[in-house]
Amino acid sequence: IAVIKSSELFDLLELNKINLLNSEFYNSQNGQAIIALSIKLMLEELHDNPTETTLKRCVDFGHSFSPLVEMYSIEKDGVEVIPHGIAVGNDCVITSIISNNRGFLSTKNLKRIVELAEFIDFRKNHYLHQSAEVMWSSFADMTKHRGGKQNLPIPTSIGIYDFIQDLKYSELELAISQNIK
């Protein structure tokens, strides 16, 4: 939610990135601030749409290309299961690359997003993250759940977002190729 909705939260994550994977950190003042702000932001989004009657939601950021990737890693691979956070993290990076390719997100902000994702190990490249076919199938399924509209939330800056309705398969392929490390 930091990338899409709160530059303040993103800044806190960046400043404290060394400690983010240490569970003890969340007892500290900065750790508590990160948790409190995350909860507040999520509740703000859910408050006005508790029954999900509005299908254009920024909280879908990270949940467009990743659902099938995550499920296939369990069902088809079984060897290297992709945890939810890593699947979502990769989805966020791919979506941010798409936004940058379209000229909405600056290269500087894309770099910040990618660097933070890499630092906290949310950018592991499982072979399923390199499959445009699997990711596009996931996106097609999510589009159905969004009333037949893509409603793809993209960051236009850190903490600012918009939606696109016309993503093409070739754009996803390009973003995936740019994400392979």
Label the model's feature ranges.
Residues 1-59:
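Carboxylate- and glycine-rich phosphate/diphosphate-binding segment that chelates Mg2+/Mn2+
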Residues 44-45, 68, 98:
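Alpha-helical transmembrane segments of multipass membrane proteins
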Residues 51-54, 76-83:
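A short glycine/serine-rich beta->alpha loop
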Residues 61, 65-69:
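Active-site His/Glu-centered metal-binding helix of metallohydrolases
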Residues 63, 92, 158:
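Residue-level signal for inorganic ion chemistry
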Residues 71-74, 93-101:
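Short glycine/serine- and small hydrophobic-enriched flexible loop segments
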Residues 104-181:
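C-terminal charged capping/lid subdomain of soluble metabolic enzymes
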